């Protein structure tokens, strides 16, 4: 069975010849302007680097990155120049978006937190009476200058409606102003806002910040004690205090480190009698803060002086002035989250150098076991996953502090049952590179169980993270197709999303840029894919492959495999080369399986052995002739293009890989005819070649933008990547095609394993053993792919990993090329269905 392959994207092969002629882009005999381009850029009539160099589409606004050999030629072609002019305005907009994203990657910016600013404003100048002077007058000034027109303070970026978060921030700002006896008008308007929206406080259907049922009542009491005329009836205040009492009652039945951490985290909003500040200060970090929270640290200073805490607040105010954020420092978590988002929505390749700088810095902090990385659970988990997937040498032993569920439950995140932290730990556990990583195994076990429990409860129902949890549990990172993954993430991306801590923590407008850039990038990919399919359909007709009665109609599935493996639009040559090669391997597979006699099979192999001397061999039948000429013309065309890109002849290597493939198919056919039962070793040696990775992946690698040395196919690293991927794909195919092949009287690894055991092993046990082998090969494959000290270029190694993921998805339910309904559904989603974003 041939391999399901992805490809690469964006190239000169995108338009079918007839369509190119219709658009005036590439006449059959080459229009004068094409010939002129060739003369200018290639010296007279010498062959250009790529066959259809001037067939670029009109620019739709996104900056195009044509295949390597195409760019110089395209620059003076009329179609290209016109397209560039049409898209100039959009390109400028995109450049602005990218610039803002880069700035945020380098130095994350978040909107000021009114709540935290208010608490920092309450800190008195050391050595003075508490009522004399603020230590940070710039924070007091910020409060005076930044009240909203409705009387509130807080983040209300997208609407002006009240929320518990805004009410909490407004009350904190009122208390800060009252403490320093300033802003009487602002206080009056703030109290009016609270009075108008007071019903929100006791509405349990409205989302609340962490600890709200404790902090808001405590601050109401504080306001009353300060002499403020609180704008609520005695009954309403009693209801608020009842909320606090119910929350305290709920918490009173347990004693744990997690509870202590939680109380310390929200200490600024607790009643004085409830707080032991000496216990709270046990959670002070090396930077002097409590949980990197300006509000909690400021509250500690209000109640007891501490040099380190004061130093922390000075560092915050020195950096931000009066615009204090709700968490600081947050750079690493924010930067890693942004990197993860860029990967998930498919635009990380546009920011590769920025991402490398962030990961280099993160790796240094990881090696130093820096608190900002190691002690924050979601940051630690995300750092491990991203560093490992990008080739940094991080050991799973460094996660020993989160190997057990008890560690999670004893943290603030665990005590709050934070789904995001749990999800990050689960994702990190799946990035295993060997069978001997028990920490990851334990972590994955308990985090996965807790996430499944959440799905069965109402905890996260109706929240955006519900979909993320369902997706992560259903599709491990090695079981997703990049284009489908990108589409799902873009459609579920919320540009208004914020981190809900004690108050909103919202990035400064960058989410809108991310969504716009990703949506346009994906739409451009779709347009490219659609043009490539038209080209492939024309190619199929020109080679009369659609007239072969013995072969399956597999062109769409072949292209889907290629697009799933090589998804960026700028790698079109690689993707089309891959798709054509897959389609041809399936034709050959069907030819040897059901469409030919032994004589015809031998005839086809003889013709390929002669290749350019094929006229010395007679065609045994019309089917042989059709298959050979389709193979001959396509391999030569792709070989000529690849040779131009690589500056040497590479066609011979592709022909050799085809010969190996056809000979292995012939061996398999001979076993079928003679009823020979091979040993497992014989079967695997032959069948991993019939998985067809050789003829499909090598030709695509030549178009990946890397100069590959002549003997790459003889390199040990290439050979091992090839072996591991072929083994995984073959075993995956065998498991899912077992029942069908049994009915056809064919053997595969499942049936051979059962036979070798003399029927002691059941079919299900054999499948389980093979699945274990697949898992082992997958881990070893990933280890080779992410390893930085190899000689194979990273982009080429990643193609093997992407191919594994494609194979896994294709064979997770059934033999991928026998499931047209499922594959067409996926194809429609990636190629034809428009994005359905949240309307941000």
From Swiss-Prot:
Main enzyme class: lyase
This protein's UniProt keywords: Chloroplast, Lyase, Magnesium, Metal-binding, Plant defense, Plastid, Transit peptide
Induction record: Induced by methyl jasmonate (MeJa) and UV irradiation.
GO biological process: defense response; diterpenoid biosynthetic process
Transit peptide: 1-56
GO cellular component, one term: chloroplast
DDXXD motif, short sequence motif: residues: 589-593
Binding site for Mg(2+) 1: 589, 593
InterPro entries per UniProt: Isoprenoid_synthase_dom_sf, Terpene_cyclase_plant_C1, Terpene_synth_N, Terpene_synth_N_sf, Terpene_synthase-like, Terpene_synthase_metal-bd, Terpenoid_cyclase/PrenylTrfase
Co-factor binding comment: Binds 3 Mg(2+) ions per subunit.
Domain of life of the source: Eukaryota
An example molecular function term from Gene Ontology annotations: syn-pimara-7,15-diene synthase activity
Cofactor(s) listed: Mg(2+)
Catalytic activity: 9alpha-copalyl diphosphate = 9beta-pimara-7,15-diene + diphosphate
Main location: plastid
Its job: Involved in the biosynthesis of momilactone A and B phytoalexins. Catalyzes the conversion of syn-copalyl diphosphate to the phytoalexin precursor syn-pimara-7,15-diene.
PANTHER family assigned: 9-BETA-PIMARA-7,15-DIENE SYNTHASE, CHLOROPLASTIC, ENT-COPALYL DIPHOSPHATE SYNTHASE, CHLOROPLASTIC
Domain notes: The Asp-Asp-Xaa-Xaa-Asp/Glu (DDXXD/E) motif is important for the catalytic activity, presumably through binding to Mg(2+).
Name of the protein in question: 9-beta-pimara-7,15-diene synthase, chloroplastic
Species the sequence originates in: Oryza sativa subsp. indica
Lineage of producing organism: Eukaryota, Viridiplantae, Streptophyta, Embryophyta, Tracheophyta
Gene: KSL4
